[in-house]
Amino acid sequence: AFQKENADWEDERRLPFVLTAARRKALKECECVFRAAQVDLCEAAPRWLIHRLGSMESALRLFWEQDAEYILYLQYDREGCPSLCATSRDIPRQLRRALWSQRIPALLTSGTLKAGMSFEPVIRQVGLGTVQKVQTFSAPSPFDYEKNCLLYFPAGREKAPKDSDQEINQIAEEILRLVEATCGHTLVLFTAYSLMGAVYNLVKNQMPVPLMEVWRNSQDTIRQFKREQNAVLFAAGSCWEGIDFPGDMVSSLIIPRLPFPVPDPIREAQRTNYMTLQDYIQDVIVPEMQVKLRQGFGRALRTETDTCTVAILDHRAAPGGKYHKEVMDALPPLPVTRQVEDVNEFIRARKGPDYFFAYRRDAKCLNEKEYAQSGSTDAAEVRTARYYLRR
């Protein structure tokens, strides 16, 4: 059940480290090399280098000795290169010993310390659960979310098997509807590169504005998206946080799937600390999803004057869905709709003329004089003309 809910993230892969005879031999040979290098370089090399070699020797020993205090795993980066990794099985205890037992006042601040409505998950994670004097405070946001943001859930969407053609087609169709409703200006945050590629192939020839993909956080693509007057950006991985698209650049944020974390050796070890799988999901997995969702939501409004629609397409997030309450708890109070027409009206009520003139089928910016001379009957341009007539 855990894997079915959460096998989404593909930014980096973590696999359990299995000690084979060949790996044991290789590790011991590497350890001997590091030890010999410390002896050979002890007179000539700087002390920090000798210390570094000693640390690497000790780290390798964890793997061939199979130290039970550590979770040992292989982490593959975006290019598929593996790294040997070890993390403590009890990080909260280490933090208590290294930090909180020193009785030095500490102030922890972040925009995503809360998971849903509670600080409890982060308090447990950083080892503050047994500390008596822990005070929490949540500052109100200066953003007027109820006025400047609209949350959309699709209505009547059938539950489709994960990664099936039916699900991919549903997502593609909904994205096209929303891009049309918001006249472009869209960021789509995927939880898996495989899903992003599949949807991209379905919609790439149907987009009314330029469509771009960010593979492994390509800064060139992000810069190109910012230069465009109007475009749609498909992104995943690290783009859920740390990228900034202020103003009308992103006026529609689409999240096809809830960002549940993928199972890995660290989470499997955490799972053994809970009596039941359900307790583990509610105490660890759901809070992680809520934090990641809030980080993704943060791409929508970057200044106090920004306006944006946010669409979550996952059927589990919709009213009546399995995680609807958890999703709403993770986000600020927002008006909610299940009608794409409301999304269109929200955008038309809040955007100026320049926003709409950058939307036409050939993806060129169109001013009033050019539009009058074009005589086009393109559906997208007819919608633009109707907008101005209503104004």
Predicted regions and their residues:
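ASCE RecA-like P-loop NTPase motor cores
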Residues: 1-361, 365-371, 385-390
